[in-house]
Regions:
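Anionic coordination/interaction segments
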Residues: 1-343
C-alpha cells in the first residue's frame, strides 16, 4: 500500500510537510474537499483502473486524440520576396526634434516617434503606461507589456516579463496571408519580418505602424479615462493590385493574479457565442476571485482555444502551430496551461 511504499523508499521525512507527501483517508474527507483536491490535482491515478503505467497510457491517448481532431494545413509555406515600399516615420528628420538613430519628438512635441526593425533595436525596453484609477496597460516598442486591474502587481490580467533586455509579449496580434501562408506579428516581437516597426507614443495612447505583404497596418491602443477596458483599433489597408485574404489571430496569456505559474490550471474560460465574448476567471485567486475579464471583437470570432499547449503545439510563441491549423479547438483552459486565442 501507499504507506508501506513511503516507508520502503525512505521518504517518511517528507510526510505532512509542504511540498511533501500527504496520506489522506477518503472516508474522512468531505465531498467538497475531495472535489477541490481533484480539481487542483495535476494528475489523478485510480488503482481500481490499473497501475500508474495504465493511467499514463490513458492520458497519452487522450492527448493524442485531442490534437488529431483538427486538420493541420502546414503544407508548403510560401514566403514571397518582400519588395514593397517600407514605412519610416523618422524619414524627414528636419521636421523632428531631438532626433537620434532610434527616435525623435514630433514637430509639435506632442508625440515621441520610435523606429525599430530586426537589425536596429533599442538597447533596452521602452515602456509607455496608459491607465486610469482602476485599470491600466503598459506597452513597449516591440508591442510587449501587460495589462492589470485594481493592482498592477497583485492582479495582473496578462503576464509580464519584467526584464530590461528581453521583451516577451503576452498580448499578440498575428496576421496570416491565407494564399501565400506567410505569417507575421503586428509588433516587432515575436514574429518580425524585414520591414520597419514604427511606434508613436502620445499622451494616453500608442500607435503601432507597419507594412508587410503590401498591407499597411496601424494599431491604436488606449485606455478610457473611466472604464476598465483596453481598446485596440486595428486598421488594414491593402496596397496590392489583387485582393488579399487574411487571417487575424489574437493571443493573450491570462494570469488574473500575481503569479503566472500559480494561475496555471485555474483559469476558467467561457465563450458567449451570442455576444461574441470570451470571459475568463481565476478560480484560485482568493483576493480577486469575483473578478471576470472579457475579450471581444468587432468581427465574429470563428474559433478559439484556452489551451496554450494546443495553440503552440510543437512550436513556440514565434511559430505557433495554431496558425497552421484551419481552426482552433474551441476548448476551455481549466486544468491546463491557459491562453486566450481566437481568430
Amino acid at each position: 500500500d501507499i504507506e508501506e511504499a513511503v516507508l520502503n523508499s525512505q521518504l517518511s521525512y517528507l510526510k505532512n510537510i509542504r511540498g511533501g507527501i500527504f496520506e489522506l483517508n477518503k472516508n474522512e474527507i468531505s465531498k467538497e474537499d475531495m472535489n477541490l483536491l481533484q480539481f487542483i490535482a495535476g494528475i489523478i491515478i485510480d488503482s481500481k483502473k490499473g497501475g500508474i503505467s495504465h493511467s499514463l497510457k490513458d492520458i497519452e491517448e487522450e492527448y493524442l486524440e485531442k490534437y488529431k481532431k483538427i486538420p493541420n494545413e502546414s503544407e508548403n509555406i510560401i514566403i514571397e520576396p518582400e519588395n514593397q515600399e517600407n514605412i519610416d516615420i523618422l524619414q524627414n528628420t528636419e521636421n523632428l526634434k531631438y532626433y537620434n538613430e532610434y527616435g525623435a519628438f514630433s514637430a509639435d512635441g506632442k508625440e515621441y516617434l520610435v523606429k525599430t526593425n530586426k537589425d536596429n533595436q533599442l538597447p533596452t525596453v521602452w515602456s509607455h503606461i496608459m491607465a486610469n484609477k482602476k485599470f491600466g496597460t503598459l506597452v513597449t516598442q516591440s508591442m510587449g507589456g501587460y495589462t492589470w486591474y485594481k493592482n498592477s502587481r497583485l492582479n495582473r490580467v496578462t503576464a509580464w516579463e519584467n526584464q530590461p533586455n528581453f521583451d516577451i509579449p503576452s498580448e499578440i496580434i498575428y496576421i496570416k496571408d491565407q494564399e501565400t501562408k506567410k505569417v507575421w506579428s503586428l509588433g516587432l516581437n515575436p514574429m518580425p519580418d524585414n520591414k520597419n516597426y514604427n511606434v508613436v507614443y502620445g499622451f494616453g495612447y500608442t500607435k503601432f505602424i507597419h507594412k508587410s505583404d503590401g498591407i499597411e497596418q496601424e494599431l491604436e491602443v488606449f485606455v478610457p479615462k473611466e472604464d476598465s477596458v483596453k481598446i485596440q483599433i486595428l486598421k488594414l489597408k491593402n496596397m496590392n493590385l489583387n485582393r488579399k485574404k487574411l487571417k487575424i489571430v489574437y493571443y493573450m496569456k491570462p494570469v488574473l493574479g500575481e503569479d503566472e505559474l500559480k494561475s496555471n490550471g485555474y483559469i476558467d474560460l467561457k465563450y458567449d457565442k451570442n455576444n461574441n465574448i470570451i470571459c475568463a476567471q481565476n478560480l484560485y485567486n482568493s483576493e480577486f476571485k469575483n473578478d471576470v475579464i472579457y475579450v471581444s471583437n468587432s468581427e465574429k470570432m470563428q474559433s478559439y482555444t484556452g489551451d496554450k499547449n494546443f495553440f503552440f503545439g510543437n512550436g513556440n510563441i514565434s511559430n505557433p502551430d495554431g496558425l497552421k491549423k484551419s481552426s482552433l479547438n474551441n476548448e476551455n483552459s481549466l486544468g491546463k496551461k491557459p491562453c486566450i486565442a481566437y481568430e
